Every structure is written in structure tokens, then in C-alpha cells.
Amino acid sequence: MGLKAYLEKIEPNFEAGGKYEKWYALYEAAATIFYTPGKVNKAGTHVRDSIDLKRIMIMVWAATFPAMFYGMYNIGQQAHNVILNGGASLPDMWQAALFTALGGQIGLESTGGLAMFLYGACFFLPIYAVTFIVGGFWEVLFASVRKHEVNEGFFVTSVLFALTLPATIPLWQVALGITFGVVIAKEVFGGTGRNFLNPALSGRAFLYFAYPAQISGDAIWTAADGFSGATWLSQAAAGNVTDWSLNADWWDAFFGNIQGSVGEVSSLAILLGGLFIIYMRIASWRIVLGVLLGGAVFSTLLNVIGSDTNAMFAMPWYWHVVTGGFAFGMFFMATDPVSASFTNSAKWAYGFLIGLMCVLIRVLNPAFPEGMMLAILFANLWAPLFDYFVAQSNIKRRMARVG
């Protein structure tokens, strides 16, 4: 018996009145991974396409793989470099013990890229697993109570949330963060398609304000004991970067040879995934370009104004793009179709506001050198208003046209 025939055979058990009716959400989620839903519209449709929401979400999920895989390698690379140079050692964490038990060695001249990748995987995969299991539990619970299908948007929420975290974050905080993002930022408003804030960023913001010591500072970015190292943005905010024309350092930041959150370090890897979802018309190029323009215009304005007391005024726009969460937020967070603006004209304003606010927070807020997370959440609140103004403008123009 084939898989499709087997699923069709057991389906009546999960439908209304069936033996396992309360588990319908789980059955539907599993079945539609392999096959499109069997339901049809009662009336004619405007667009007919074989793709559905699950396939769209899976494509976005797959688009994060370049940043994810490089991020795991970079975790190992950063730890290897500081241990090899002396003054640091393997951390007293079960992830490092697992790596050693698997036969891995790091911090040696003979250490290769595969060992670095394995070391990073020992840290990131548990984070992603906890995110998926805990967040998936809440998704299934709400779907079962409301008697509807499991929303596929969690495929994307889970991986985006995990990629914005440092490798050394405690797993119980990961569970709390994704719980806040799924339950408070999404499900209480009705679930996928009804939330007005980005769930992944809402969960990260909760962790930032509730447990700042484990998600910010200098000691969390490298998975090694006895080493503290600031991110590029933190160094710039402290006035430790005086020559922004260092091309070699910029390329290091672009390729991802720097410290940072797992999925935010390599602008090149992010660019590959971002261009894919733009090509597939899943992400809006207007929002991406708007974010880039907003950041470039405002940072250039601050460069012209200058400051004798704040070194961040001199930071060029092309450095803003490759440091912190700017690139990752621009491609994967700002383009969330639910919490972003919907109309084309509003997308430009929405994106521009994000880029402007990110640079504004980075430069003028000394307590928070990273600004993309707060900029996107702030713009989420403005997105409906931008759409409203565009809709009203279109209505007035059409009314004037018809007299």
C-alpha cells in the first residue's frame, strides 16, 4: 500500500466523529507535507496554482539554509581561533562534551572545517530543536482547541527565531522566547495571518529585555571559556573603530568571519537566500530596497553632520549593512507578508522607515548598538497606517476621475 492510499484510509478516523478526531490537526499537518490538501473551493478562484501556504513556507525555510549552515561553521571557527591562539578553552557545557564524545577536536593546528561545523552544530541544533518542539507544541495545542489545521507559518518562525540567537544561550530561555513569540505575539491575535507583530522578533525582544545578560554583551558570542569579544557594532559604539576604509575588515564582515548571532554573521549567505525568495516572489523587493535606501540615506546624512563625541556618526552605510542583524532583518524579517505593509506604495515607506530607524537606534542610542529588531517591530505598528493612507489616496483619486 502506497503512502497516499494509507493516508486516505486512516483519514476518516481523524475527521469529525472519528476515533481520533482531536488529533486532526496533527494528521493534517503530516499529510500535507507530502500532498496538497484535498479540499476545493466552493466558488471559482481568481488564481489557480498548485502551490499552497505550506510550500511557500518551506521555500522560505530552505532559503535560510545558507545562513544556517555558515552560522554553524562560524561558531566552530570563532571558538577554534581563540583556543588556538591561547587564553581560551572548551566551555564547561554539555554541547562541548557532546562534541568531544563524537570524537571532535578543536583548537588544534590540524582542526579542519568539518570539525568546526560539527562543533557549531552541537550548539545550534539543540537551540533549533527546542524552538521547534516547544513552538510546535503551542501551535498544535491552539489548532486542536480551535479545531483548525496547524498553520505552516511556524516553519519559518521557528528557524528565524533560532537564527537570531547567540550560540551560548541557555535552552530554557529559548523555550521561553519562542513561547512568547508564538502565544503572545501570534496566537492571542488569532494565529497566522492575524498577528500585527513579527512573532520571531517579538520572542527575541522578550529575551532581550527579560534576560539581557544572555543575549547581549561581550562574553556570549564565542563558545569558549576565558574569552570575551565585542561584536563589530559594540566596538564601533565604544569608539574602537576609527578607520572605516579598511576594505579587508569589510570583506571579513561581508563573508561572515566575525562574531554575532548564528544566522546574522554572513551577509553573503543571507544575500543568497534573500535573492532566492525575491526571485520566487515570496519576499517583496520594494521592502528590501526601501530598507536599504532608508539606512543609506540616513547614515549618509549623519556622516555629513558628524560628531566629536559619537564615533557611530562616521559609520558608512555599507558598514551598517554587513554588521549586526541589518542584512538578515532586511531580507527575512522585514518582508514578513503578515506584519508588513500590503500595498506597493506603502511597502516603500515601510521599508524606508525600518532602514532609517535601524540607523537612528544604532547611532543615537548608546545603550543599544544593534537596532534592526526594534526598528522592524516599530515599523510593524505603522504598517496598517501606511496601507490606510495609500488606500484613501487611491479612493480619492478614483473618485475624482469619475467625477
UniProtKB/Swiss-Prot annotation:
PANTHER family reported in the protein's UniProt record: ELECTRON TRANSPORT COMPLEX PROTEIN RNFD (PTHR30578), NA(+)-TRANSLOCATING NADH-QUINONE REDUCTASE SUBUNIT B (PTHR30578:SF1)
Q: Does the keyword Isomerase apply?
A: no
* Class in the EC hierarchy, top level: translocase
Q: Which InterPro entries match?
A: NqrB, NqrB/RnfD
Location(s), subcellular: Cell inner membrane
Supply the name of the protein. Na(+)-translocating NADH-quinone reductase subunit B
Q: What is its main location?
A: membrane
Cofactor(s) it depends on: FMN
* Gene Ontology terms: biological process: respiratory electron transport chain; sodium ion transport; transmembrane transport
- Entry's transmembrane regions: 56-76, 114-134, 165-185, 260-280, 287-307, 312-332, 348-368, 371-391
* Family indicated by similarity: Belongs to the NqrB/RnfD family.
Give the quaternary structure: Composed of six subunits; NqrA, NqrB, NqrC, NqrD, NqrE and NqrF.
**Keywords assigned by UniProt?**
Cell inner membrane, Cell membrane, Flavoprotein, FMN, Ion transport, Membrane, NAD, Phosphoprotein, Sodium, Sodium transport, Translocase, Transmembrane, Transmembrane helix, Transport, Ubiquinone
Kindly list the organism's lineage: Bacteria, Pseudomonadati, Pseudomonadota, Gammaproteobacteria, Alteromonadales
Per the record, the domain of life is Bacteria
A single cellular component GO annotation = plasma membrane
Q: For the modification FMN phosphoryl threonine, which residues carry it? A: T231
- Native organism is Pseudoalteromonas atlantica (strain T6c / ATCC BAA-1087)
- Gene behind the chain: nqrB
What this protein catalyses is:
a ubiquinone + n Na(+)(in) + NADH + H(+) = a ubiquinol + n Na(+)(out) + NAD(+)
